């Protein structure tokens, strides 16, 4: 690739989130920052594609994704290729770092700010000497890890906490744990209020009413699969639509798929997600309550408030103190609470009534806060 003209206002984002039709925090904030600053150029480093793993699993779809893709006049996505496991030493990390450095050089990025969400890029970011912001969105120290993975993550995060120009967290729990040794910036999640309140047609793959809808990633550390199965067994007349990527163990996915009234609809384009929530008889949040979920600031909490649909949730962080239309109940009462709401005449009537306005933080507000942090870190890096 021929090096591009030099770009002075630039950002390298090392993210745990893929770049695709499913938009999460980092991707959304990048979109907002680019919209706010007409001079900003971004290199978005998506999770590395593990070549041996994908071949071993026979999954070829990710292998077909372009290594380098221009997705916007000022946004380029790099999908690094990972050929070696980290267990054999630093070679794998060095190979990934070289791919990022080469892409930044080819794009002509000058002294970019490095926004780290994937802590495995800690040594790369700090070795460059470029200003760095560490953005902690989940407490992966509390997730299911092997001892080797946990030790590596602890080392990477300790380096970032000690040497980053700023540390941003998205939840009060993360502010407490990561703020024990240094100052942190709390920037929670948000929502595109206009998108979620603008009426959309009923999605063609949404099952007929009555239907309970869950929107979000199905994940072993946060999704209560037995609770979903309990709901399906107790209410065979209720369709349950699970909208989002499926990262469950294969056995759990198969248990859900085996039930006729449970529909695994997979990931949906971000701009179509509101339609699933707007046409739900009820939105359900069957989350596990554990140390990992206590660290989260669920984006879906903001989306539920914006959409205004009746919602039943387990007492998970981010939902407990929201109030109507969010009904929080313990796990033992979850199925009964869903049944009572579905059977309520007001549930059907409410679908035709616009949601009462609620004050909900927007992604633009969160991006403005993030931009302030980044500008402060940039300024500090050039101060005499």
Q: Which positions does each model-derived feature cover?
A:
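Nucleotide-sugar-dependent
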Residues: 24, 220, 271-276, 283-303, ...
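Membrane-proximal helix-turn-helix segments that form the acceptor-binding/catalytic region
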Residues: 101-105, 147-167
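Carbohydrate-associated surface elements
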Residues: 173, 187-199
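Conserved donor-binding/catalytic core segment of Leloir-type glycosyltransferases
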Residues: 205-222, 228-232, 359
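Glycosyltransferase donor-sugar binding loop
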Residues: 215, 239-251
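Nucleotide-activated donor-binding/catalytic signature segment of Leloir-type glycosyltransferases, i.e.
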Residues: 250-274
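A charged, aromatic-enriched C-terminal amphipathic alpha-helix characteristic of glycosyltransferases
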Residues: 346-379
């Amino acid at each position: 690739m021929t090096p591009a003209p030099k770009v002075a206002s630039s950002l390298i984002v090392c993210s745990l989130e893929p770049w695709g039709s499913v938009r999460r925090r980092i991707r959304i904030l990048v979109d907002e920052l680019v919209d706010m600053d007409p001079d900003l150029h971004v290199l978005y480093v998506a999770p590395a594609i593990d070549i041996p793993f994908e071949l071993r699993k026979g999954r070829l779809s990710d292998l077909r994704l372009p290594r380098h893709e221009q997705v916007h006049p000022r946004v380029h996505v790099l999908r690094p290729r990972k050929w070696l496991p980290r267990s054999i030493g630093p070679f794998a990390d060095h190979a990934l770092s070289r791919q990022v450095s080469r892409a930044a050089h080819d794009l002509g990025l000058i002294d970019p700010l490095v926004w780290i969400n994937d802590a495995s890029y800690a040594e790369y970011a700090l070795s460059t000497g470029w200003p760095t912001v560490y953005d902690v969105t989940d407490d992966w120290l509390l997730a299911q890890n092997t001892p080797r993975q946990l030790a590596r993550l602890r080392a990477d995060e300790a380096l970032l906490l000690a040497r980053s120009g700023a540390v941003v967290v998205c939840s009060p729990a993360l502010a407490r744990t990561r703020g024990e040794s240094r100052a942190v910036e709390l920037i929670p999640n948000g929502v595109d209020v206009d998108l979620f309140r603008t009426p959309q047609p009923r999605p063609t793959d949404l099952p007929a009413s009555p239907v309970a809808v869950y929107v979000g990633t199905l994940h072993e550390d946060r999704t209560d699969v037995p609770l979903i199965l309990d709901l399906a067994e107790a209410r065979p007349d209720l369709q349950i639509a699970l909208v989002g990527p499926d990262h469950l163990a294969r056995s759990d996915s198969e248990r859900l798929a085996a039930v006729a009234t449970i529909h695994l609809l997979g990931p949906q384009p971000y701009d179509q997600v509101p339609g699933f929530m707007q046409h739900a008889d009820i939105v359900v949040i069957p989350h596990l309550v554990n140390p990992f979920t206590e660290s989260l600031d669920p984006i879906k909490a903001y989306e539920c408030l914006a959409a205004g649909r009746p919602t039943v949730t387990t007492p998970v962080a981010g939902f407990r103190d929201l109030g109507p239309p969010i009904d929080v109940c313990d796990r033992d009462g979850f199925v009964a609470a869903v049944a009572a709401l579905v059977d309520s005449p007001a549930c059907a009537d409410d679908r035709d009534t616009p949601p009462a306005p609620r004050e909900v933080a927007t992604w633009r507000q969160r991006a403005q806060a993030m931009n302030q942090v980044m500008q402060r870190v940039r300024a500090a890096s050039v101060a005499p």
